[in-house]
């Protein structure tokens, strides 16, 4: 088996590798290992703010939007989050600080990354009827390394109308693709066109 990086690559966060003098089963084994075993960060828990509140201008806003919280949480889980393989985080069940703690209470800087979002729909006097909330509106409370990358900031999450707001804390932990699709580190493998 011979491998070589295709000329002109890597580009940004992508790479193309040409594998030759091999058969499909060997390449498939590599593909399956990359899918199943490479550690990746993904959002696993989201705590939404609920209720009605009043903003600084006295306008009453409610924490509702067009998507149920469960659907929005699933979308958040699928957002690509940078993973630092140089200084990896522990899996929560292996973290020295959290492994003996009840699952709901697990989480520390050694095993999770914390994100937050606070967005509201257009104000009552605005001409706009709706505002789209994007992945780029999410900010990290942890290390800035884990900020959503520019190429993923335009992923739409939901739409807010006048009088609506969305506020949450999201918790990302390390996992592997064999456990859930949100931890897939590999986006695409393909054969060159012939």
Model regions and ranges:
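Protein-protein interaction/assembly regions in multi-subunit complexes
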Residues: 1-190, 194
